């Protein structure tokens, strides 16, 4: 049985760890609220942009096909995945799930554009599909970072370096569940850009576009994709913080359980040592009394 001194040291060590896990829980909770507020502030703009682009698409000519819609006829398309992971660990299975999902869906010749230090390190020098000079952080998503990634993706697609670009991120299903998901960024799918029924605030009748629908589409399509990436980055960041909160809450509860068990063991050990000391004192006193007679 461990000594009372050793048990006390273990209890103090676990208490120190519990302070850290509890602090990380509070930090993640604060970051989650901030990220959600940030997304709520900008999402109306991007939602309106999606509505706008869906009203422009029907006015585009069938021929020639706009490059953003062009499905390249090739047996082996040059495919890339923009993958959103976290910069830090200690978030349960968050990073492992997204990497596993990526490998299950990717082919041998695909390319991985990984956002987040944890995912980058997991594939660096281990998977030749990783594009090593593509290096962006995932902490606290910003519009500028999403814009830079969008520009890189569009340039690679237009130049023919890539034929298809997919976005893999963690989607929040509900307050307790999040799952990896994949959406195609380029080429765009006309079927997913159909106009919604007009609401009270929408213009009536036909909308004229100057100088042309093609030119308008050229201007707003990158903003639409920018919104897709920023939304995915923000949702993934929220999912990461939620996963870390769950992991840290579980760790704190486990630490409490361990402390409770160790405290009982410490009390039993301490009680045993006190009982032994009392027994020795009584035995010594009895021996002294016997020697006096």
Where are the model-predicted features located?
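C-terminal beta-strand-loop-alpha-helix "lid" module of Rossmann-like NAD(P)-dependent dehydrogenases
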Residues: 1-293
